Amino acid sequence: MAHYPPSKDQLNELIQEVNQWAITNGLSMYPPKFEENPSNASVSPVTIYPTPIPRKCFDEAVQIQPVFNELYARITQDMAQPDSYLHKTTEALALSDSEFTGKLWSLYLATLKSAQYKKQNFRLGIFRSDYLIDKKKGTEQIKQVEFNTVSVSFAGLSEKVDRLHSYLNRANKYDPKGPIYNDQNMVISDSGYLLSKALAKAVESYKSQQSSSTTSDPIVAFIVQRNERNVFDQKVLELNLLEKFGTKSVRLTFDDVNDKLFIDDKTGKLFIRDTEQEIAVVYYRTGYTTTDYTSEKDWEARLFLEKSFAIKAPDLLTQLSGSKKIQQLLTDEGVLGKYISDAEKKSSLLKTFVKIYPLDDTKLGREGKRLALSEPSKYVLKPQREGGGNNVYKENIPNFLKGIEERHWDAYILMELIEPELNENNIILRDNKSYNEPIISELGIYGCVLFNDEQVLSNEFSGSLLRSKFNTSNEGGVAAGFGCLDSIILY
C-alpha cells in the first residue's frame, strides 16, 4: 500500500479522527467494571485501515449463506424427531458434555413434558458463519471456522466500522491529496438493519397466528447478560426495530425473567407483569456458554421462556444444531446429503469444510485421538460451547487431554488448522494505543431464516463482519479481549 505506513504525525491525526467519529456515531463498548460509571464508554477496538479480502472469496461466502441457513433449519427440524440420527447424536453428546450440552438437552426434554408448554411452530434462526481464507494449496479459498446459531454479535457495530473507514477515505483523512481506495470496493454492511428486519418479520408472523384478541403491539425481548459490555451493538438493533419497523423492545436478564414475566396458563403467551406487554419474540444475546448461567435459577429462567408461546431466536433445538459435533458430522458427504440433496449446493458447502475429527471410539475418532496426541501442531481442539477463550491449540492439546478422563474426550472435536494470509499493512487501535503487528482476519456472514416444523418460510443473507487479531493470538473474540473490528476492501 503506497500510503503505508503513515508518519507519526499522520497516525496521531488518524487516531484522533477514529476516536471522534466513533464517539459521534456510537462505535463503542463498555470497559470492564463499567457499572461504577455507566457514562464511561470507550471506543471499540478497531483497525485504522480496511483489510483487503478477495472479491471471489467474499462473493462465495455471501452466496452460500442462504444454503447454510436452509441446512441448519433442516437439521433443527430433523432433531425434533426422536428416531432421527441427529436427535440420538445430541442425546449421546449430552452425556459427554453434561455441564452445557447436557443441560440444554435436559431443558428441551423438560419443555416437552411440561403441562404449561404451548408449542410455537415458528423458529427464528439468526446465524453467522465465520471463515478464514486458506492459502495452503496456493489458491485462496474460504474455510469455515464455525457456524454460530445463538447470540451472534457485532451486526450493529460492523456497519459502523465499515462507515468509519469509508468516511476516512472519502474525507481524505488517509491522504490529503484524495481517496486511496475506490469507494465501490469498500463493503458497507447493512447487518444492523437486516437483523432488525428479521426480528420484525418474526413479530408479524407471531401476530398472524393470533385471533383479534391479541395485543396489537407485541414486543421483542432481548435476553442479555448482566452488566453487558457490548450493549451498544445491541442498541443498534433495538433502535432500528422501533424507528424502521415500529416494534418496541425490552432488555431483560435471566434475573428479570424470573422476577418480571408471567405466562398466561390458557394461551401460553408471555407477558411483562407490570405493564402487561405481550412478548412476541424472545431474542437471546446470552445463554451461549456455561458462564451465562450463574445459578440454577438462570437455567430455570431459560426453561420458563422455552415453555412460552413466544417465538424464540433461537429455541433450544436451533441452538443445539450449532454444536461442534454436528459441524464435524456435516463434513461427511453422506450426512450432509440427508439435508441438502441438490448436488451443486452440497458441493459448494463441502468446499468450505476442513477436516474435523471426533474423539470417540469410532474408526475416525481413534484416528482423531492419534493425531491429537502425535501431531497436535496442525490442529485446534474445540468444545461444544461458544465464546472466545474456550479452544485449545497445537502443542497444548496433548497435556490438556491427558488432564481429563478419556471418556470425556468425545465432548470435543479436533479441527484442522486453517492457514490464512497475514496482513502487515494495518494498525489496531485499542484503548487509544496503536499496534502495528501482522494480523489475521476472520470473515463473518450473517443469515436469518424463519421456519416451522416443515418449511423454510424466509431465508436471507443479512450482512457481513470482519474481525482481525494479532497473528500471535489464537483467539479472535472482540468482547472477550482477543481481537478488533475491521472492514473489507475488495480486490
UniProtKB/Swiss-Prot annotation:
Gene Ontology annotations of biological process type: glutathione biosynthetic process
Pathway: Sulfur metabolism; glutathione biosynthesis; glutathione from L-cysteine and L-glutamate: step 2/2
Keyword annotations: ATP-binding, Glutathione biosynthesis, Ligase, Magnesium, Metal-binding, Nucleotide-binding
Ligand binding (Mg(2+)): 146, 148, 386
Reaction(s) the record says it catalyses: gamma-L-glutamyl-L-cysteine + glycine + ATP = glutathione + ADP + phosphate + H(+)
Binding site for substrate: 128, 150-153, 228-230, 234, 285-288, 467, 478-479
GO molecular function, one term: glutathione synthase activity
Cofactor dependency: Mg(2+)
InterPro entries: Glutathione_synthase, Glutathione_synthase_a-hlx, Glutathione_synthase_C_euk, Glutathione_synthase_N_euk, GSH-S_sub-bd_sf, GSH_synth_subst-bd, PreATP-grasp_dom_sf
Residue positions binding ATP: 146, 324, 382-391, 393, 415-418, 442, 469, 475
Family per record: Belongs to the eukaryotic GSH synthase family.
Subunit (UniProt): Homodimer.
Species annotation: Saccharomyces cerevisiae (strain ATCC 204508 / S288c) (Baker's yeast)
GO-annotated cellular components: cytoplasm; cytosol
Gene3D superfamilies the record matches: 3.30.1490.50, 3.30.1490.80, ATP-grasp fold, B domain, Glutathione synthase, substrate-binding domain superfamily, eukaryotic, Glutathione Synthetase, Chain A, domain 3
Enzyme class (EC, first level): ligase
Cofactor note: Binds 1 Mg(2+) ion per subunit.
Enzyme Commission designation: 6.3.2.3
Protein name in UniProt: Glutathione synthetase GSH2
Other comments on record: Present with 3430 molecules/cell in log phase SD medium.
Pfam families hit by this protein: GSH_synth_ATP (PF03917), GSH_synthase (PF03199)
SUPFAM superfamilies, per the entry: Glutathione synthetase ATP-binding domain-like, PreATP-grasp domain
Top-level taxon of the source organism: Eukaryota
